[in-house]
């Protein structure tokens, strides 16, 4: 263990295991003890945007995955596919392959978006009437004269700046705590469905799997003595 690294403290409530460099930064992401693999790593970014568009909550999730088989090695899903059905009827598919981003498909066309790109129809129509560049520059990281707050349709480049602006103005940031909770919860739901290997039913209001003891057990984990927290999960 590196001399300046408190391995016991770093493990927190997870099981105490011998130090292994791969279990710490950066690769802790590929161990279920500490993270949720690509589903929670990149998924939290993309599902956040996707659920802004869906404007509903998932009620049924189906998942399948392949897992590594190396002893004492990475244990998160490496090949995975999850399908979410939302309360409003929308279906969202999440997979480990394909372009890194979100594809919205509707009656009027398709739009691809990620954290730096938005393209497709009707987005291409904006080339004839583009968004003012000043709107995009306004929230750049180094703009100390950025507007005090963002409107609903303003482009937000500096999320940290938007957060501090909203703290000062007592307003809701473009990416608020509720949407973040729902985004990461949706990622975990996908992992739970993949672990069970079947379809699970989800009550988004009660935040439980009704009548599904197996899935419900995966909502929490055993907590190591000295690091217990009250999660509120039964």
Each language-model region and where it sits:
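Short, solvent-exposed loop/turn segments at the edges of secondary structure
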Residues: 5, 75-79, 97-99, 106-107, ...
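Active-site rim elements
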Residues: 32-40, 66-71, 143-153, 166-179
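Core domains of carbohydrate- and sulfate-ester-processing enzymes
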Residues: 1-22, 121-124, 220-221
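NAD(P)-dinucleotide binding in Rossmann-like oxidoreductases
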Residues: 83-155
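Acidic/polar loop patches that form or flank catalytic/metal-binding clefts of enzymes
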Residues: 18-21, 56-64, 91-94, 111-115, ...
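Rossmann-like dinucleotide-binding domain that binds NAD(P)(H)
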Residues: 8-88
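Non-transmembrane alpha-helical segments in soluble domains
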Residues: 7, 11, 47, 51, ...
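C-terminal helix-rich "cap/oligomerization" subdomain common to oxidoreductases
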Residues: 75, 165-234
């Amino acid at each position: 263990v590196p001399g300046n690294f408190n391995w016991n403290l770093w493990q927190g409530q997870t099981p105490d295991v011998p130090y292994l460099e791969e279990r710490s930064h950066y690769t802790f992401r590929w161990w279920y003890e500490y993270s949720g693999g690509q589903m929670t790593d990149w998924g939290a970014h993309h599902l956040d945007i996707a659920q802004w568009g869906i404007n509903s909550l998932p009620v049924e999730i189906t998942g399948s995955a392949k897992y590594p088989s190396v002893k004492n090695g990475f244990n998160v899903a490496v090949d995975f596919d999850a399908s979410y059905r939302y309360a409003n009827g929308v279906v969202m598919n999440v997979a480990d392959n394909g372009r890194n981003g979100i594809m919205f498909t509707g009656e009027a066309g398709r739009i691809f978006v990620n954290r730096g790109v938005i393209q497709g129809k009707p987005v291409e129509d904006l080339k004839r009437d583009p968004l003012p560049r000043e709107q995009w520059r306004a929230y750049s990281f180094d703009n100390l004269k950025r507007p005090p707050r963002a409107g609903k349709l303003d482009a937000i480049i500096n999320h940290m700046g938007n957060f501090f602006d909203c703290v000062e103005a007592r307003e809701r940031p473009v990416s608020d705590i509720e949407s973040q909770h729902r985004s990461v919860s949706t990622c975990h739901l996908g992992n739970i469905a993949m672990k069970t290997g079947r379809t699970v039913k989800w009550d988004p209001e009660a935040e439980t799997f009704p009548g599904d003891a197996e899935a419900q057990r995966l909502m929490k984990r055993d907590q190591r003595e000295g690091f217990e927290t009250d999660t509120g999960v039964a």
